[in-house]
UniProtKB/Swiss-Prot annotation:
CC terms in the record's Gene Ontology section: cytoplasm
Record localization: Cytoplasm
Organism, as annotated: Escherichia coli O81 (strain ED1a)
GO molecular function, one term: RNA-3'-phosphate cyclase activity
Pfam assignment, any one: RTC
Similarity-based family: Belongs to the RNA 3'-terminal cyclase family. Type 1 subfamily.
Keywords: ATP-binding, Cytoplasm, Ligase, Nucleotide-binding
Function summary: Catalyzes the conversion of 3'-phosphate to a 2',3'-cyclic phosphodiester at the end of RNA. The mechanism of action of the enzyme occurs in 3 steps: (A) adenylation of the enzyme by ATP; (B) transfer of adenylate to an RNA-N3'P to produce RNA-N3'PP5'A; (C) and attack of the adjacent 2'-hydroxyl on the 3'-phosphorus in the diester linkage to produce the cyclic end product. The biological role of this enzyme is unknown but it is likely to function in some aspects of cellular RNA processing.
GO terms, biological process: RNA processing
Binding residue positions for ATP: 103, 283-287
The enzyme's E.C. designation: 6.5.1.4
Identification of the protein by name: RNA 3'-terminal phosphate cyclase
Length: 338
């Protein structure tokens, strides 16, 4: 019998990422875990619908036995079984992030006995989670270099707080993992601005694009009007394609916040990324830790190692026989496997 790993949900940033990473790693390694103080660092601690859906999805895919899988629970015991490929559908029942549920279960399906398709309904444009286009255009091309073949499709948008969106991913078992080397971003090839609107006047998008164009030379400017029943909602994105990597940044519009202020938030975030020679943005760094650990080799550079990143590394090191090195030089941190 494999040893039970005990995790403190309050460590580091104290959010849901500790639970999601633990679920992924438990499914992959077969190691059971207990976590207490789930989301202790949040204003509303314990399992929300999104986290509960991730737990139930993980349990279904690997036939796990679970204790504490209920809304508001701050303690969970997870004993995994064998991961099995298949066609899975999960509903969050709120505007909780579809992509964060997918993020939890897809790594385990890299080790399944056959190809899989996972469909999740809930929120797709959430201010605290990556949109499907980030997964599709930024993360999945990098995963392909590592040896992971998966394809995400956004079937229907669902903005916060209404939800109602649908995202699906097709994924195949990984034959072998490759080392990812992302030391330098390289020169910028082009930048693309994009605005999504659902039940929001078009002039909002035009003002947001104008704000982006006032700060950056945009090779593309796209406005997409979605059906009103997928809103109301508004998301502004800016994609930076460089020689070695494509990064994508986004901001979700808010009621009573002007189009110019929303877009200015995005401008500030992109300028912060471009001010550093680091290849990887803050959020993408979190996403690369697990596949890099599974490969057992690789490195990337990031401007600032967030608390989120360091917490994720700590969880990975509890489950896998790897050690990460974080070395800061001239304002850039190089993250690698020792």
């Amino acid at each position: 019998m494999k040893r039970m790993i005990a995790l403190d949900g309050a460590q580091g940033e104290g959010g849901g990422q500790i639970l999601r990473s633990a679920l992924s790693l438990s499914m992959i390694t077969g190691q059971p875990f207990t976590i207490t103080g789930i989301r202790a660092g949040r204003a509303k601690p314990g399992l929300l619908r999104q986290h509960l859906t991730a737990v139930k999805a993980a349990a279904e895919i690997c036939r796990a036995t679970v204790e504490g899988a209920e809304l508001g629970s701050q303690r969970l015991v997870f004993r995994p079984g064998t991961v099995r490929g298949g066609d899975y559908r999960f509903a969050i029942g709120s505007a909780g992030s579809c992509t964060l549920v997918l993020q939890t279960v897809l790594p385990a399906l890299w080790f399944a006995d056959g190809p899989s398709r996972v469909e999740v309904s809930g929120g797709t444009d959430n201010p605290s989670a990556p949109p499907a286009d980030f997964i599709r255009r930024v993360l999945e091309p990098l995963l392909a270099k590592i040896g992971v073949h998966q394809q995400t499709t956004l079937l229907r948008h669902g903005f916060y707080p209404a939800g109602g969106g649908v995202v699906a991913t097709e994924v195949s078992p990984v034959a072998s993992f490759n080392s990812l080397q992302l030391g330098e971003r390289g020169n910028i090839v082009q930048m693309r601005g994009e605005v999504l609107l659902a039940g929001v006047p078009r002039h909002v998008a035009e003002r947001e694009i104008a704000t982006l164009a006032g700060s950056f030379s945009l090779h593309e400017q796209n406005i997409h009007n979605l059906p009103r029943d997928q809103g109301p909602g508004n998301t502004v994105s800016l994609e930076v394609e460089s020689e070695n990597i494509t990064e994508r940044f986004f901001v979700v519009g808010e009621k009573r916040v002007s189009a110019e202020v929303v877009a200015a938030q995005l401008v500030k975030e992109v300028k912060r990324y471009l001010a550093s020679p680091a290849a990887v943005g803050e959020y993408l760094a979190d996403q690369l830790v697990l596949p890099m650990a599974l490969a057992g080799a690789g490195e990337f550079t990031v401007a600032h190692p967030s608390c989120h990143l360091q917490t994720n590394i700590a969880v990975v090191e509890r489950f896998l026989p790897v050690r990460f090195s974080l070395i800061e030089t001239d304002g850039v941190t190089r993250v690698s496997i020792e």
